[in-house]
């Protein structure tokens, strides 16, 4: 086992229970023969972390959160062959059992014992974090800030797999968060001849234009966008082949089906409050043969996400708008809640 001198303890963000977190000294994780220990350089913060803070999603407590982890390997088990000490890596945080009903049917995303570092297992809001070596991927050309976007990019790749857009598709993407902006770019790269991005006017849409995320942009009025939605329908009387709802807002997901073309697809892509409900007409779904598809997390999409970002085909310039120290995590949550940011990251030291 390759080694170097390591401290016995580390600084970590620790939740005892929902809404109850503190900065603590925790033991540096011990690794097994097939695992690596990372010195975390940065970890992204996303909407899922807000839901974890509230005790929603699939979170388990107590917990060290953080699921968009970048770091350098400082310790490797003696069975590790794919990476080595000194490699900068990003981490696929999903863990599956390989033996349940769904895993054996080749659909491990639905694993009955599904776990995720930073959600149900300890993650990257700490100075050190451990992962199975099979779940880490070296990066070369990405800054730490850019690398925080690999995990959400992998979710966008999975979303693309679920949509399977036909060449020449017309697509409407609602919401301009990080993973939505990357999915918009993936649609452009994979068959869509027209991508329309609709989101609230402000910083996110400004960045969307800078990275050329879409073909057309609709800057929605935050207070009253009713006329703009009506105009969108008038301008597109037959709707869109693909509609992606990426806001996580209950009222918008309810309305999004009204922009789907007959025979088209609605991708439910946002992270919603557990209490959110939809009231779609089954007759409309039946008569218009609308495909309603969910896209949750990802499995086996990291290599493609790394390749897209390393090549520059997916642009991420300026998407990380705020970086905080781990001790400033409450400020990070407050900034995210204010909607005055696009992507936030945390540095452990």
UniProtKB/Swiss-Prot annotation:
Which reaction is catalysed here?
A: D-arabinitol + NADP(+) = D-xylulose + NADPH + H(+); D-arabinitol + NADP(+) = D-ribulose + NADPH + H(+)
Cofactor binding mode and count: Binds 2 Zn(2+) ions per subunit.
Q: Which GO terms describe its cellular component?
A: cell projection
Q: What is its EC number?
A: 1.1.1.287
Q: Which SUPFAM superfamilies match?
A: GroES-like, NAD(P)-binding Rossmann-fold domains
Which superkingdom heads the taxonomic lineage of this protein's source? Answer: Eukaryota
Q: Does the keyword Transcription regulation apply?
A: no
Binding site residues for Zn(2+) 2: 97, 100, 103, 111
Annotated residues that bind Zn(2+) 1 are located at 46, 67, 151
GO MF assignments: D-arabinitol dehydrogenase (NADP+) activity; zinc ion binding
Q: Which Pfam families match?
A: ADH_N (PF08240), ADH_zinc_N (PF00107)
**Which cofactor is essential here?**
Zn(2+)
**Which coarse location class applies to the principal site listed for this UniProt protein?**
other
Instruction: Kindly give the InterPro entries that the UniProt entry links to this protein.
Output: ADH-like_C, ADH-like_N, ADH_Zn_CS, GroES-like_sf, NAD(P)-bd_dom_sf, Zn_alcohol_dh
Describe the pH profile of activity: Optimum pH is 9 for the forward reaction, and 6 for the reverse reaction.
Q: What induces it?
A: Expressed at all stages of early rust development (spores, germlings and infection structures developed on an artificial surface), with highest transcript levels present in haustoria.
Supply the enzyme class, top level: oxidoreductase
The family this protein is said to belong to: Belongs to the zinc-containing alcohol dehydrogenase family.
* Function statement: D-arabinitol dehydrogenase which mostly produces D-arabinitol in haustoria, the appendages of the parasitic fungus that penetrate the host's tissue and draws nutrients from it. D-arabinitol accumulation may serve as a carbohydrate storage compound. D-arabinitol is also capable of quenching reactive oxygen species involved in host plant defense reactions, thus providing protection for the rust fungus during the pathogenic interaction.
Write the protein's name. Answer: D-arabinitol dehydrogenase 1
- As recorded in Swiss-Prot or TrEMBL, the protein's gene is named ARD1
